[in-house]
Structures are given as C-alpha cells and as structure tokens.
C-alpha cells in the first residue's frame, strides 16, 4: 500500500512467476481488493485492522517502516501471521538527515536564511561540533549510523540502549535505567528509539528538566516516544535551548500548532528517509522477502510481535 512505480511493481511480480502484485494509495482504497491476498506491505503507522479482518488468507505482513506500532492489532497477535519490517533500509538517509538538522542548528542556518529573505546582512555566530557530547538514546542500526557520522566531527558519543554491549562508535554505553544520570552530561540528545508500549512518552518533563539549558533535543524516531506538551513547555520556559524534529504526534502538523512559530525549533515534515536510495533499498528488501515467502523460506527482518521490534 504505497505509490510504487510501474517499473518497481513489475520487478516484484517478475521475481515470483505467476504472482499478482497490486498497489493502492491507501488502506481504504485497498480494502475491497484484499480478500484473496496472501501478503500485505504497508507503512507501520497505517491502520491494518480493517485489512486483516477482510483478508483471511494473509500469512505475511511487511512494514515499509522500521516501526510496526499500528500493525500490532489483536488480530495480528492472535493469527499466525509473519510480520517483518524494513530495519536497516533507513540507516543512511535518516542518519544523514540527523546530521543536516544538527549542523543547521549549530551553524544557525535557519537564522541566516531568514536574514537572506529579509535582505539583511547579519552574521550570526554559530558553534562547532568539535568536542561536543552527543547522547544517542536507542542504539540500533539508525543510532549507530548517526554515531558513525557524528564521530567524524570529533565528538564524544554516549549511547543508551536496553542492554549493555561494546559499541564501535560509542565512547560509553549506558542502560535505559541510567538515562537520568547521563542526560545532564549531553550537549545534544538524539532520540532514536522504536515505538513500543515501553517507550511511550519516554521523554517527558523530568527528562527535559534533567538536560542542560543549552542542550539541543533531536527526534528522528517516532512521535510517541516524546510527551509533546512537555517538550513545548521545556522550549517555552528555556529548560532546553532548542529542538530539531522530523516526527509529530499529529501529521500533517495542525496550522495552529506552537511549533510553527517557535524560533528555537527546526522542523522537517517526516522526510528523514525520503531519498531515492531509500526506495531502491526498500524494494530490494521487499523483493527478497517476497521470493523467500513464495518458497517457504525464512524471511529477513522478522519482528518479535510481543516485543514490538
């Protein structure tokens, strides 16, 4: 369920001779056509419940996202449906986007653009990333990719993850239980957690209060991991210096949302992964799994439905 090109659709269908591959723009548009479907691919934030109710034959669901939050319905949990995701596909594009946001903030690029539009020659004084401490909360493949790129700027990388392990691109690794102790050490806090029941509102008033007043908060993961009202409050009160955001609790962002007018917020409209390379990698993964599925072989990126990732 996505706008795939005719070329990509043909590639998928040709990979499994005798198969039928159809694409629809939305779950609502697809609903009348899924009764005989064996597999469905859609975004992890789309509502799958009506589709599964109308598709008794489905044995495999693939999330075009890393996240699968809205796919874990009662029927999904109860039926023997294999669930896979697009883990690893987004790493390069999302990590590059994160660095773009971070550098834009540090070098005050949005302010320079506003001055350009106003025809004003003002020279805002930016900062260097050199020597800064970056805390990455959620150190999966995207978190590691961000760390790898940030290390080029000679930064110190702190990682928070569920279980301790040695990490090539992290100077120190902490558990989630140690988050409150490590937050005050960071100049930049990057949220890279999956969306699960355990991570809902993971960043709230207490977490923002524990950060430096000069800290920058970046969320390129999922909106559900942040208490958005608490973030707005922290930004308005100056508890933190600013935020760079690619995900929001409601998308498109409502016209009256406070973020629109906040000069200490840089926003992008959920575009961190939207580059041509992403689509090529995504369809390659989908094609590999489609072939494996048709042969009864093990699928890549199978999700533990109980854990949610």
Spans of features found by a protein language model:
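Glycine-rich Rossmann-fold phosphate-binding loop(s) that bind the pyrophosphate
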Residues: 139-140
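A short, aliphatic-rich alpha-helical micro-motif
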Residues: 33-34, 52-55, 129, 181-184, ...
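Rossmann-like adenosine-cofactor binding region
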Residues: 164-258
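Rossmann-like dinucleotide-binding domain for NAD(H)/NADP(H)
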Residues: 83, 214, 220-309
């Amino acid at each position: 369920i996505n706008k795939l090109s005719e070329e990509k659709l043909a590639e998928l269908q040709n990979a499994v001779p005798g198969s039928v591959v159809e694409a629809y723009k939305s779950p609502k548009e697809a609903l009348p056509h899924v009764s005989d479907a064996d597999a469905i691919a859609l975004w992890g934030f789309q509502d799958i419940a009506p589709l599964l109710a109308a598709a008794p034959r489905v044995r495999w669901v693939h999330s075009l996202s890393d996240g699968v939050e809205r796919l874990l319905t009662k029927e999904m949990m109860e039926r023997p449906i294999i669930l896979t995701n697009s883990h690893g596909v987004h790493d390069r594009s999302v990590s590059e986007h994160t660095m773009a946001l971070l550098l834009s903030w540090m070098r005050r690029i949005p302010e320079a653009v506003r001055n350009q539009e106003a025809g004003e020659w003002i020279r805002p004084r930016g900062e260097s990333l050199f020597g800064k401490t970056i805390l990455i909360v959620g150190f999966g493949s995207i978190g590691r990719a961000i760390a790898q790129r940030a290390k080029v700027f000679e930064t110190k990388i702190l990682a928070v993850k569920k279980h301790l392990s040695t990490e090539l691109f992290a100077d120190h690794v902490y558990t989630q239980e140690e988050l409150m102790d490590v937050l005050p050490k960071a100049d930049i806090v990057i949220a890279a957690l999956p969306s699960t029941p355990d991570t809902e509102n993971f960043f709230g008033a207490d977490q923002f209060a524990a950060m430096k007043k000069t800290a920058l908060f970046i969320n390129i993961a999922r909106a559900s991991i942040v208490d958005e009202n608490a973030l707005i409050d922290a930004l308005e009160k100056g508890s933190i210096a600013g935020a760079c955001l690619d995900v929001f609790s409601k998308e498109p962002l409502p016209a009256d949302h406070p973020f629109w007018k906040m000069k200490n917020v840089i926003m992008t409209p959920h575009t961190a992964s939207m580059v041509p390379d992403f689509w090529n990698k995504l369809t390659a993964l989908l094609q590999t799994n489609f072939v494996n599925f048709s042969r009864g072989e093990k699928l890549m990126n199978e999700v533990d439905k109980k854990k949610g990732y």
